[in-house]
């Protein structure tokens, strides 16, 4: 009898995607993050659904409904902190997944890479809107500051901001629509993930060597399912340690104060995973220039395939490029630190220097280094 998983129309799709999928035999632990992101997305949708059952998207009751979830709902505190810290884990995995793509040259799969960038933008938008929902001080002022950046767009900026707000300030209409979008966007992310996987399975996975692995493939199950379960166990250990011992470590104390429009917090800052982009935004004194730099800091990923001048795909055998890659990582960590600091000396100059180095590294230093390495191969 023919195996059901190979003949049933639905099971066949799952089989080709997760069971009999031919995978390169040499892919390392850096290839775990795709499946971990899938787990994070599932966790966020499930915990978010349970939170939505008790949350009210009204400015008068939003803050107290979150308090009610934490105090009165059975395991409400656990669901809330799993959701909040799950977002942090999601972004940690996202950054490592993108970093892996940069290091091993996975961006040469253009469709997969571009869908990935679209996914990154969508997840960032979802996270931003989710941060507004508890309606604490940082929620309100974060929403005000970030949405107000759109007013820098010539001609239509102010009208666009008022249209997003649903009035002349961040208020009830803003909160209601942010909740609606925050609920629907994860399902759009899920659809995009399916397209991302569809394009990936057209070409097959990349591998650390960067060369074709068609001659040496092994089935995804059991080899990589077991490997991914180890990654999942480590992720859950980190997440549960955060949730059960340091639930508020990555949050902001100001968000435990209900939103108060007349009173501005001393330092307005977003969640930690947006701080690198926020630091780039703040490093430019001009408002429109800052907004453009903010957008370019993510959009720059889309032009990386065009900047690839090396004859080798992966950085595994390119030590100079490896140095620049780890400089870029250090740079992003510096920007993340600066984004959380007040706007004063010496943080201003450090932020400006790190921002210049970020763009300089990707746009000029990396392509030049690739050309030098090509010449070194001939020597």
Curated annotation (Swiss-Prot):
Binds 2 heme b groups non-covalently. Its main location: mitochondrion. It is a multi-pass membrane protein. Coiled coil: none annotated. The cytochrome bc1 complex contains 11 subunits: 3 respiratory subunits (MT-CYB, CYC1 and UQCRFS1), 2 core proteins (UQCRC1 and UQCRC2) and 6 low-molecular weight proteins (UQCRH/QCR6, UQCRB/QCR7, UQCRQ/QCR8, UQCR10/QCR9, UQCR11/QCR10 and a cleavage product of UQCRFS1). This cytochrome bc1 complex then forms a dimer. Heme 1 (or BL or b562) is low-potential and absorbs at about 562 nm, and heme 2 (or BH or b566) is high-potential and absorbs at about 566 nm. Belongs to the cytochrome b family. This is Cytochrome b.
């Amino acid at each position: 009898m023919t195996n059901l998983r190979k003949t049933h129309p639905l099971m066949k799709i799952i089989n080709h995607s997760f069971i009999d999928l031919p995978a390169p035999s040499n892919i390392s632990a850096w290839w775990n993050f795709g499946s971990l992101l899938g787990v994070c997305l599932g966790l966020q949708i499930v915990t978010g659904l349970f939170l939505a059952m008790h949350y009210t998207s009204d400015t008068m009751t939003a803050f107290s409904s979150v308090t009610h979830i934490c105090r009165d709902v059975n395991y409400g505190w656990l669901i809330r902190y799993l959701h909040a810290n799950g977002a942090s884990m999601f972004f940690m995995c996202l950054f490592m997944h993108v970093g892996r793509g940069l290091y091993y040259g996975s961006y040469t799969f253009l469709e997969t890479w571009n869908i990935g960038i679209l996914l990154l933008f969508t997840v960032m938008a979802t996270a931003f809107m989710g941060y507004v929902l508890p309606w604490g001080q940082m929620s309100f002022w974060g929403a005000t500051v970030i949405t107000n950046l759109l007013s820098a767009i010539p001609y239509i900026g102010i009208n666009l901001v008022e249209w997003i707000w649903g009035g002349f300030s961040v208020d009830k209409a803003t909160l209601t629509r942010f909740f609606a979008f925050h609920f629907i966007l994860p399902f759009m992310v899920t659809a995009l993930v399916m397209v991302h996987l569809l394009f990936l399975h057209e070409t097959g996975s990349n591998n650390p060597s960067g060369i074709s692995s068609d001659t040496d493939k092994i089935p995804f199950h059991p080899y990589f399912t077991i490997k991914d379960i180890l990654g999942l166990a480590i992720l859950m250990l980190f997440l549960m340690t955060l949730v059960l011992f340091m639930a508020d470590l990555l949050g902001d104390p100001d968000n435990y104060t209900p939103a108060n429009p007349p009173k501005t917090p001393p330092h307005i800052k977003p969640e930690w995973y947006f701080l690198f982009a926020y630091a780039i935004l703040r490093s430019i004194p001009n408002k429109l220039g800052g907004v453009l730099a903010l957008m370019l800091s993510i959009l720059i990923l889309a032009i990386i395939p065009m900047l690839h001048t090396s004859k080798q795909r992966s950085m595994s055998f390119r030590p100079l490029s490896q140095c620049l890659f780890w400089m870029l990582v250090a740079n992003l960590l510096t920007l993340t630190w600066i984004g959380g600091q007040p706007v004063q000396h010496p943080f201003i100059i450090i932020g400006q220097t790190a921002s210049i180095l970020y763009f300089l590294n990707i746009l000029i230093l990396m392509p030049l280094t690739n050309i030098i390495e090509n010449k070194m191969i001939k020597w």
